[in-house]
């Protein structure tokens, strides 16, 4: 981070499948003046205890965060839905460095964003905002799957091979680019 001198750092979970353009999230982050922005979405409350569940105020500022709570809080006005973290975190670089160094000094910490860092900075009323991947207030639906279990991985794989997949890997407006370096055999 010191060498690159980037202003922002985007941290992504490796066990999720979704399609997202991060530019609107970065724009939201910059306009809100947030130190940290968390990608969020709503899911049925019965499934929410598998994720980090959060509460927001009217300005989308995160006011509470609990990692995998036994009794998740519903979204106000939507008693059967909960707001969860997608494992997408956008940090101002200096905030990330400060909080990771600070957390490293805490012996009882598990050094986990959802268990330790986010709850602490939210409790301290730092500038942490929620960026909705899909807006429950507008009944938007977008494809996002956690594939952290074998069953979830299988179900997501089956989603992709359906006749009309929710996430179309052949969408010409969303090309998949990769770089395969020329390596010796």
Q: PLM features: residue spans?
A:
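Glycine-rich phosphate-binding loop signature in dinucleotide/nucleotide-binding domains
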Residues: 1-6
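Short aromatic/hydrophobic "clamp" motif used to bind/position activated sugar donors
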Residues: 9
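Conserved core of the sugar-phosphate nucleotidyltransferase
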Residues: 19-94, 98
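Left-handed beta-helix
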Residues: 94, 98, 102-185
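Active-site acidic Asp-centered loop
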Residues: 12-13
């Amino acid at each position: 981070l010191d060498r690159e001198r980037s202003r922002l750092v985007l941290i992504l979970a490796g066990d999720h499948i979704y399609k997202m353009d991060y530019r609107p999230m970065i724009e939201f982050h910059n306009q809100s003046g947030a130190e940290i922005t968390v990608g969020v979405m709503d899911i049925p409350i019965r499934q929410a205890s598998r994720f980090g569940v959060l509460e927001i105020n009217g300005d989308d500022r995160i006011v509470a965060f609990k990692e995998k709570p036994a009794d998740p809080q519903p979204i106000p006005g939507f008693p059967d839905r909960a707001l969860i973290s997608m494992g997408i975190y956008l940090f101002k670089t200096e905030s990330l460095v400060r909080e990771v160094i600070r957390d490293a000094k805490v012996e009882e910490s598990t050094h986990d964003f959802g268990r330790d860092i986010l709850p602490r900075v939210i409790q301290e009323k730092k500038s942490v905002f929620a960026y909705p991947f899909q807006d429950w207030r507008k009944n938007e639906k977008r494809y996002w799957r956690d594939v952290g279990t074998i069953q979830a991985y299988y179900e997501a794989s089956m989603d992709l091979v359906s006749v009309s997949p929710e996430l179309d890997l052949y969408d010409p407006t969303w090309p998949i680019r990769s770089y395969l370096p020329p390596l010796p055999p």
